[in-house]
Structure formats: structure tokens, C-alpha cells
């Protein structure tokens, strides 16, 4: 049984849109990585010590919390935002990217 092929056969439009969103997400991640580098997540450490990993993941959690609070405010205002490029969709993509970044940190892959 191939769940991916089965899913794509049953839900072709949904599968295609999901892949488009993943591409948008990756493009945003890549452009932000070129701006920020890895240091903003590793906080100056090599992330080889479990305590450094825990500290980094806690920082990611705090960033996600900020995005969730931003989403809450945006949704209360029916999506009206005051910062260009920081709307509801952008916030959801940021949260999703932070989730992947946390996994990369925890899997010891957050490096060049």
C-alpha cells in the first residue's frame, strides 16, 4: 500500500495545493536563512550539548508563541494587519517553518 499515491489519487487538487504551499514555505525559509544564517536559532552554540538544544528549542517555542498571539490579533481584526507581509497566511507559514526548524535542531541537523 502506498499511502501517498492513494492520497494523490483520491484528493488530487488537495495534494497539488499542499505541495504548492510546501514550496512557498521552503522559498521563505531559504530567503530568511540567507538573511539570518543559523546563529539566530543556535544562539551562538554548536548545539552539541543537550542543554544548548533545549535552550534553542525553547527559543523557537517562544517565537511560535509570538506568531500565535499575532494570529489571534489578526483574526480578531478579520485579517487586517499593519505590517506588510505579516498577514494570516504568512504567520501560519512561519509557525510551520519554526516546527521544521525545531525538528532540525533536535535531530542535530541545524548546521551548514
Language-model features, listed with the residues they occupy:
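Intrinsically disordered, low-complexity regulatory regions
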Residues: 1-112
